């Protein structure tokens, strides 16, 4: 069994789930899986993946796990009570080998947002681990050697250059993830600030980290009062739920231009910072700093969180470029948890519909957008004043 606990997921799944429970408990959603890595035959492992999903759906939170969640300042008592009764239901998930694309799998999740939101991260971890344990021999000594080099590189930087682990969804294996976190904790000291993984945060006494993901803002394209106001509605909903806590806003759901138009003086003051997850990080940081300054907000009081495909070299370059001008945080994923030699898979599970309507992410990076309805993508770009899609 790959997943042993429902806590073996990213914190932001629980923080979003709490907001869904309180504000949109009846919302219905569709998610779809996509493998962006060409030539990967996952279909041969569909039965093995299915058995792991069955095991996942038998899990419930133990009393000590619920108590741990209760201990987090932003988890409310009614949500903890709800989680004590919660389990993932297999009826909301469909998994088959693709009938039209040999080697591919068709994985869809459809059901109440409240009851399906926790599927994504463990499913991706399952697919990764099934793939790698069947197609490669792990060289853990090579992984440890690479990890020591990364620790040494970071230790050569000023103490303010700090990282967090964001690598659950694309890790090589649960075992490797569990081994490397104490190595980072002990090797980096205060330069390692925590992990997005709630299970390992509990196990190793680390700080669990995370706020919101793209799906939260995407859903408001269907839940909000009108499409043009969907980002504002999502951010205001978040502020109602957390009253200033967990104040990192995700900036690339409909591209940075549209985000900055919506992120007015109120949001600049209310939120603690913004997270970069696509596009050029240096250009993004410069534009965010300029935006804050234009609203008479001192960037040195705000946090810029970088989390898009980071490695230690990029962390160091970003730190050197920005550290005197703002506060910084770096979430490193695949480069930490899946760097043992074999090529990591580029796999995602994205929300594609909410309440029967298409929703989409207009990423600042080509190829990261995902939507089933091309007409809706064109409409979304038009509503937010973005250039038309390239035809062809």
Curated annotation (Swiss-Prot):
<dbReference type="GO" id="GO:0034355">
    <property type="term" value="P:NAD biosynthetic process via the salvage pathway"/>
</dbReference>
<dbReference type="InterPro" id="IPR006406">
    <property type="entry name" value="Nic_PRibTrfase"/>
</dbReference>
<keyword id="KW-0597">Phosphoprotein</keyword>
<feature type="modified residue" description="Phosphohistidine; by autocatalysis">
    <location>
        <position position="214"/>
    </location>
</feature>
<dbReference type="InterPro" id="IPR007229">
    <property type="entry name" value="Nic_PRibTrfase-Fam"/>
</dbReference>
<dbReference type="InterPro" id="IPR041525">
    <property type="entry name" value="N/Namide_PRibTrfase"/>
</dbReference>
<dbReference type="Pfam" id="PF17767">
    <property type="entry name" value="NAPRTase_N"/>
</dbReference>
<protein>
    <recommendedName>
        <fullName>Nicotinate phosphoribosyltransferase</fullName>
        <ecNumber>6.3.4.21</ecNumber>
    </recommendedName>
</protein>
<dbReference type="GO" id="GO:0005829">
    <property type="term" value="C:cytosol"/>
</dbReference>
<keyword id="KW-0662">Pyridine nucleotide biosynthesis</keyword>
<comment type="similarity">
    <text>Belongs to the NAPRTase family.</text>
</comment>
<comment type="pathway">
    <text>Cofactor biosynthesis; NAD(+) biosynthesis; nicotinate D-ribonucleotide from nicotinate: step 1/1.</text>
</comment>
<comment type="function">
    <text>Catalyzes the synthesis of beta-nicotinate D-ribonucleotide from nicotinate and 5-phospho-D-ribose 1-phosphate at the expense of ATP.</text>
</comment>
<keyword id="KW-0436">Ligase</keyword>
<dbReference type="Pfam" id="PF04095">
    <property type="entry name" value="NAPRTase"/>
</dbReference>
<dbReference type="InterPro" id="IPR040727">
    <property type="entry name" value="NAPRTase_N"/>
</dbReference>
<dbReference type="InterPro" id="IPR036068">
    <property type="entry name" value="Nicotinate_pribotase-like_C"/>
</dbReference>
<dbReference type="GO" id="GO:0004516">
    <property type="term" value="F:nicotinate phosphoribosyltransferase activity"/>
</dbReference>
